[in-house]
Regions:
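Extracellular cell-wall/glycan-interacting regions and their flexible linkers
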Residues: 10-20, 87-90, 98, 157-160, ...
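Glycine-rich catalytic cores of cysteine/serine-nucleophile enzymes that process amide/ester linkages
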Residues: 224-252, 284-288, 361-424
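N-terminal Sec-pathway targeting helices
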Residues: 1-13, 22-23
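Solvent-exposed hydroxyl-ligand-binding patches built from regularly spaced Ser/Thr
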Residues: 33-104, 111-196
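Low-complexity, Gly/Ser/Thr/Pro-rich intrinsically disordered linker/tail segments
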Residues: 396-482
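Sec-dependent signal peptide cleavage junction
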Residues: 20-33
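...with weaker cross-activation on analogous glycine-rich loops/strands in unrelated enzymes
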Residues: 313-395
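N-terminal capping segments
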Residues: 198-312, 445-482
Length: 482
């Protein structure tokens, strides 16, 4: 082969290579950034508990989004594999049904997500005060110009998958909306959707202040505004703490979900009737993974959140959510205090085994003690299922009592403070009274038992002398009553 022929061959090969590259580039999908409403898991409820449940199947889930006016089903990057079939699931842990995100899609797989609710440059939320067809929508005091491409739709939250439907501009009158903005500050999309009212807790804890008083104040912060979700504040994959459990302050998603619901909310089946169970439309995690981990807190999720907020000033560090049964013993093993199974039902305050700030792990439940009253009853805080006034099993974070009857001092204190400071909650739920024989018990051959803080050489101190105060004195002080 002479040199001219060789050059021709090389040139032909170069042209073929360039052509192949251009064709491949044209065919191969590009990364796309899209605005999307997260709707939920495709086939939610299909994977349920059982002897043959393969938990690793959650890594193969597909997810529904509302994008560009239609529902689309996509995969989501699972993150790093930490053990066979179990990944870090960073993106799944960030997604909340019915919320609006900017997402990046690569080859039909979501690679990143960003919640838009917290970005005032890209979203304006509030009540529609004025509208004019094809011209503007006024949200609060903000007048936002419409374009011919402005989308208008309605988001509906519901267990099993949220939904989105197109609506007209007249449907927006006097309703709450989220308006996303284009690069010129004009309305890109208008979502008619639920927006919670601003909530201010009646108690004021100090994140990271390691005192017994602040621990108990922190425990009261989410009372009356957080619903019970089984697996709530565990992470999505049911391995440890959710993002909410390591959030400083009450997570906004807890507040949103509580205000969205009413006395008909049930964390499981309607009327508590298991014969009517339908995993595809229930908030209960029948598949041992927690789609609604962001919406509320179960007992251990709540205590984990309280511990985190007492010991930390910033969000996002390692959390403390674990099985309720082993919480008390684990905290003792951390060097924070002592653990014992040597407890009995108290008959008076002086001889009670239950002190201020104790954490009691039952088999399958955990609660925080605010101390023993003179009559031996105990004021507690916990997240627990309780029936609503409509007979629906809901409940959540609340002040309750352990005692023989509603005449006991602890119940009277719980009732007084719940009704005074959490009236909206009390429109849905009655104050809970638990019998001592039901709430002060455990299996001897388990990790269950009572944890007490070492206030001399442990992680918490007691400069306010809460150890020697009665529950009535403690509640009065925390709520800053004269």
């Amino acid at each position: 082969m002479n040199s001219k022929t060789l050059i021709r061959v090389i040139l032909v090969l170069i042209v073929i290579a360039i052509g192949f590259f251009l064709i491949r580039r044209k065919i191969a999908p590009k990364k796309m950034e899209k605005e999307a409403v997260f709707l939920g898991v495709e086939g939610y409820g299909d994977l349920t508990k059982g002897e043959k449940l393969d938990h690793s199947l959650i890594s193969k889930f597909k997810f529904n989004f509302y994008i560009d006016g239609e529902q689309k089903t996509l995969s989501i990057n699972n993150g790093k594999e930490v053990k066979e079939g179990v990944y870090t699931f960073e993106l799944q842990n960030q997604l909340q049904e019915g919320y609006v995100y900017d997402i990046v899609i690569d080859n039909d797989t979501v690679e990143s997500v960003k919640l838009l609710d917290n970005d005032s440059k890209t979203m304006i939320s509030g009540k529609v005060n004025d509208i004019e067809q094809d011209k503007f929508v006024q949200v609060g005091e903000e007048k936002i110009e419409l374009t011919k491409n402005t989308g208008i739709c309605k988001i509906t939250w519901k267990a099993g998958n949220s939904s989105v439907e197109k609506v007209g501009i007249d449907d927006l009158k006097d309703k709450t909306v989220k308006v996303t903005l284009d690069k010129d500050g004009k309305a890109k999309n208008i979502y008619l959707t639920f927006i919670s009212e601003k909530y201010i807790s009646p108690v004021i804890p100090i994140p990271g202040e390691k005192t017994l008083k602040n621990f108990l104040t922190t425990a009261l912060q989410p009372v009356g505004t957080t619903l019970y979700i089984y697996g709530g504040s565990w992470d999505w994959q049911d391995e440890g703490s959710s993002l909410q459990a390591t959030t400083i302050g009450i997570p906004q998603s807890w507040i949103d979900f509580y205000q969205y619901q009413n006395a008909d909310y049930t964390y499981r089946e309607k009327d508590g009737n298991e014969e009517t169970k339908n995993p595809s439309s229930s908030y209960y995690p029948y598949g041992e993974w927690n789609q609604y981990c962001y919406a509320g807190a179960d007992c251990s999720g709540y205590v984990g959140w309280v511990i985190y907020n007492t010991l930390n000033k910033e969000s996002g560090k390692d959390g403390y959510v674990m099985g309720a049964t082993k919480m008390a013993k684990t905290f003792a093993e951390n060097g924070w205090g002592t653990w014992t199974q040597d407890v009995k039902i108290p008959t008076n305050r002086d001889e009670s085994d239950f002190k201020v700030g104790d954490i009691f792990s039952m088999n399958g439940h955990v609660w925080i003690s605010f101390g023993t009253c003179d009559d031996g009853s105990i004021v507690i805080a916990h997240s627990t299922p309780s029936d609503s006034i409509n007979g629906q099993p809901g409940g959540g974070i609340q002040i309750s009592a352990i005692g023989p009857s509603e005449d006991c001092e602890a119940y009277q204190l719980a009732k007084m403070y719940m009704e005074k400071y959490y009236p909206d909650w009390c429109k849905r739920y009655k104050v809970v009274l638990k019998k001592p024989e039901d709430y002060i018990k455990f299996k001897k051959d388990s990790a269950a038992g009572k944890f007490s803080w070492n206030l001399e050489n442990g992680i918490l101190t007691d400069p306010d002398d809460y150890t020697n105060k009665k529950p009535a004195e403690i509640l009065k002080d925390i709520f800053q009553e004269k």
